[in-house]
Amino acid sequence: MLKIIENLSEKTAEQLYDFFSEKPSGLYVLFALLDWTGVDGAWLQSIDSDVTALVVQREQSKVYVTARENADFYELGDFITRLGGMVIHCPADITERIGMTAFSKISLMCIEKEIESPRKSVEINDNLRPVFDLLTQSKQKILTQNPNVKLREVKKYTDRAYNEWLARTSRGIFNGYTSVRAIKQGVNAILSVAVADRLKSSVYIRDVATDNDFRRMGYATDCISGLCSDFKTQGEMAFLACNDLKTENFYKNLGFETKEYMDLGIIEI
């Protein structure tokens, strides 16, 4: 039976950790629950006294699902259908079992090999605007190149997006589960950044970026390997999600291995 999780807090994901931490897909869904202020609803499925599945509905019509082998998959599919018009993220091995049609795939990759780290990163807790600008560098460039988009509209868009990103990131830093690390040159120049969330002994690297000019010089590998290596020291398991083959192969060269695939799709009525 599925029941709503009442009184969500930053402790909710931690309380469910032991049930869903065996596989990267379970952790991926738990990290979707970690930023609980952006969650529109969360439900647990249990059979007798055994917790079998977790459903998390987030902003922008996204649903994250993880389930154990003894879950009631028919109930899961029927329930998600009733949520209506959602893009579903679920482990590839349960896609058909909940009646979902997949249209895309992401790979969950874990650090398995020792990463050589010629560049050391530093942790950043304040003045995060340069971090955000680097993470969104390519998107802002696309906007500014569009002749139909005025510069003031780009600034308005990026300022609003920054405030939303800052709210989530600073909240995570304040609550002790988010770390922002950077490769710096000199005092102010940031060459590469990464943002990761931490839940017990697991670390989810959710955002990585390297300055465009610096990347063209061929230093992205050195920077990102340093960032990932430093995050690995914060937990027993460090993983990230890739949504294309080129990125997946890039991280394989850094010492990551693909452990599991998540399907993105919909349940057609």
Task: Give each language-model segment a name.
Residues 52, 57-123, 265-267:
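Acyl-donor-binding surface of acyltransferase catalytic domains
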Residues 21-81, 192-206:
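Conserved donor-binding loop and adjoining core beta-sheet/short helix segment
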Residues 57-58, 145-209:
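A conserved beta-strand-loop-helix scaffold within acyl/acetyltransferase catalytic domains
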Residues 1-28, 111-163:
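Short amphipathic alpha-helix that is part of the acyltransferase structural core
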